Amino acid sequence: MSKKIQSVRGMNDYLPVETAVWQRVERIIKSVVESYGYSEIRTPILEQTPLFKRAIGEVTDVVEKEMYTFNDRERDAKEVVSLTLRPEGTAGCVRAGIEHGLLYNQEQRLWYMGPMFRHERPQKGRYRQFHQIGLEVFGLQGPDIDAELIMLTARWWRELGISEHVTLELNSIGSLEARANYRDALVAFLEQHKEKLDEDCKRRMYTNPLRVLDSKNPEVQALLNDAPALGDYLDEESREHFAGLCKLLESAGIAYTVNQRLVRGLDYYNRTVFEWVTNSLGSQGTVCAGGRYDGLVEQLGGRATSAVGFAMGLERLVLLVQAVNPEFKADPVVDIYLVASGADTQPAAMALAERLRDELPGVKLMTNHGGGNFKKQFGRADKWGARIAVVLGESEVANGTAVVKDLRSGEQTAVAQDSVAAHLRTLLG
């Protein structure tokens, strides 16, 4: 017997019982996004490696440790090209916008959803292949669009029933110049206390010192209580931008906490950064995160363009929804199950099923196949979550009727086949 081949570590299969829950979550997410006027963009999962090095930063953990990268060669070409499975969605979205002229003096509001890849240690809520939804806005620089993105996410939480289990953390990391000044002050402070830093922080101190601020080491966190505050180094425009954002959120009734150690892990951010966090998923507390990246388009070869966006991991979101909202169930696979007794009734049953699909668009109808007595067929209807059974026996076929049975109340009615669709429409509401 041949050896079974298993899935790659950290890359999961999602079986029908799981994908049904995912699909309901995704429907809610998409409905909210589209209600705000965003348009979907789809980009490749493979990009040239320099895109991520330039966008994310060469000394970030993502680029240094976590990317799936390989060399590729066209059949007739001598040049080897380095390609990478996308670890995040913003860089590819910006690349596509520049390449196709979407960002030239234009406002764009885009969203995307799909798999991303990072070579991390797999654990609950963090996998090597994971799925993200992201929103990106180009061409708008005021705090009002930052606020709208946060309001949109707050609407998600309400629709998913998790509002009481997520909290918003905000910060401003200022302009590139202000952040450079703060970086120098932070490095000077860390050098004075180098003996108190762990090896990871010592490495980051010179390569990416702002990442020391979100160290999980309790001793480092205690040391940082005396470190220079990022807020003291903000330029005036960034202060005004952040104050405007806070005022808009307060007007919308969205509570937040200012966290001056919130910096995000990617180099392209400036000014606004934010995270929605939860205490309901253990150590994996971040549910959704993003911020402003006004310099990235120019950095990747386009014209200077204001930009802001965020991304959310769907695995973590589904875990949270299921953990805190037990009433959240997958939509039924089937609304109506068509029961047919005997092979002689099957042609009529299948013809009726097709007619009902024509007359009831959007209704999920499954026809019984494989025979079986009525008891077995009603058992299958229950397994698929059907609310209603339409029953065709030999007598119904002969006289042009069908029995419509409400599987919740047990009530059933004989209906002319030409009237079955109207009767079902009434029952389904």
Swiss-Prot record:
Disulfide bonds: none annotated. GO terms for biological process: histidyl-tRNA aminoacylation. It comes from the Bacteria. GO terms for cellular component: cytoplasm. Its main location: cytoplasm. It catalyses: tRNA(His) + L-histidine + ATP = L-histidyl-tRNA(His) + AMP + diphosphate + H(+). This is Histidine--tRNA ligase. It comes from Escherichia fergusonii (strain ATCC 35469 / DSM 13698 / CCUG 18766 / IAM 14443 / JCM 21226 / LMG 7866 / NBRC 102419 / NCTC 12128 / CDC 0568-73).
